[in-house]
Amino acid sequence: MAKKQDCNLSCSECSVRNCYRKDKTFPAFCLTEQYPDALERTRKFYASNTTDGKLARAAAEIEGEYYGRLTRLEESIRFAKKLGVKKLGIASCIGLLDEASLYAKIVRTAGIETKTVICKVGAVDKTQLGIPDGLKVCPGCNEACCNPALQAQILNEWGSELNVLVGLCVGHDAIFTRHSKAPATTFIVKDRVLGHNPAAALYTAKFYYKRILDEKTFPEPRKEAVEAELAAAKPAKTTAKKPAAAKPTKKPAVKKVAK
């Protein structure tokens, strides 16, 4: 095994890719040769009857059976059936509810029960999280925050055996997977600009979309949003009230006694 290299080189800098076919030589910084203990641990639990082992084998079997022949939609259903899933949870963005509804219908056609929970469940206004009203997409309106933790907890209580994410926001998907008791996989990745195809930014990064390679050309946030953030960060001004002047006490009138 190679010794761990004191550098930041990793798989993204490798052009050998010997880990796939093992018909070449591993580079000096190869992670495969630098973590023997972790490698042995993962190899053991993939071969075991644990949840990770079942997931790994099901995914590998589907790859071998249908490589290049199934859409991701079809593959997710084959994956669920191979695992013996009876109850499949769907955590959807409200903006992709039509797509989630059609996906649920197709899954049910395959004989699997579904339950869909949209991101705005709970209807908690963003201001209740401490978000300034000016940072809403529509300031002045009731604007519910996404609630991925509640989505996960509802599906947990329902007893889902596999959860599928449909267009959850960046970050909200991370919260959902942290709270989901069942394994979670993704069907649609949200990209509001590129029609939910985030890889398109990489396909055009060297020419049409080259701004992503230069931090200086990154779009500025909305002016109204910045102003709202600044206003929220300023401490509230308090004007000290002057103490009220003490009222003069009247001396009691002295009655004159007649001599």
Q: Where in the sequence are the language-model features?
A:
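Short glycine-rich or small-residue beta-strand-to-loop segments that form or flank ligand, phosphate
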Residues: G84-S92, T116-K120, L162-V166
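Short, flexible loop segments at boundaries between secondary-structure elements
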Residues: K181-D214
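Active-site glycine-rich loop that binds ribose-phosphate moieties when present
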Residues: E143-E157, L168-V170
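Long, charge-dense
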Residues: D98-P148
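Electropositive, gly/pro-rich neighborhoods at or near active sites that engage anionic ligands
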Residues: A2-K87, I94-E99
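Gly/Ser/Thr-rich loops at beta-strand to alpha-helix junctions
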Residues: Y66-L70, S92-A100, A123, V166-A174
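Intrinsically disordered, polybasic Lys/Arg-rich low-complexity tracts
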Residues: R222-K259
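Short Gly/Thr/Asp-enriched flexible loops that form oxyanion-binding sites at enzyme active sites
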Residues: E99-I106, D173-A182
